[in-house]
């Protein structure tokens, strides 16, 4: 089984083109899709990055990641920070980042796009 988890930006949700079309393509490739949802984040990215990460981690814990043979994170903006940090933590290597932030870079891995 294959899983794709989408991490939105603060104002760029999964119904916007980059994530919407990514989701459609992945569904056609037989990925199960899960979406992270952020609530009440400050538009100042430096202020909101830790809260966004906490919210993403809380939601990821509800997914049975061990049930999947392949896991892909697709993320945008503040979501790139959360996805990169969680991928580092869970030792996952499949990531696609749209508009990564400066503080995302410390968690990027060689195989990331």
Where in the sequence are the language-model features?
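The feature captures the conserved acid-bearing segment of alpha/beta-hydrolase catalytic domains
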Residues: 100-113
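Aromatic pocket-lining residues of Rossmann-like dinucleotide-binding sites
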Residues: 26, 86-90
């Amino acid at each position: 089984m294959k899983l794709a988890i989408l991490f939105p930006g603060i104002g760029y949700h999964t119904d916007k083109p980059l994530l919407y079309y990514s989701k459609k393509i992945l569904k056609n490739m037989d990925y199960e899709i899960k979406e992270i949802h952020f609530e009440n984040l400050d538009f100042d990215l430096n202020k909101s990055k830790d809260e966004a990460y906490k919210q993403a981690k809380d939601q990821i814990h509800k997914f049975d990641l061990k049930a999947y043979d392949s896991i892909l994170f697709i993320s945008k903006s503040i979501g790139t920070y959360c996805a990169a940090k969680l991928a580092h933590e869970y030792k996952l290597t499949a990531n696609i980042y749209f508009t990564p932030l400066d503080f995302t870079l410390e968690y990027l891995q060689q195989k990331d796009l």
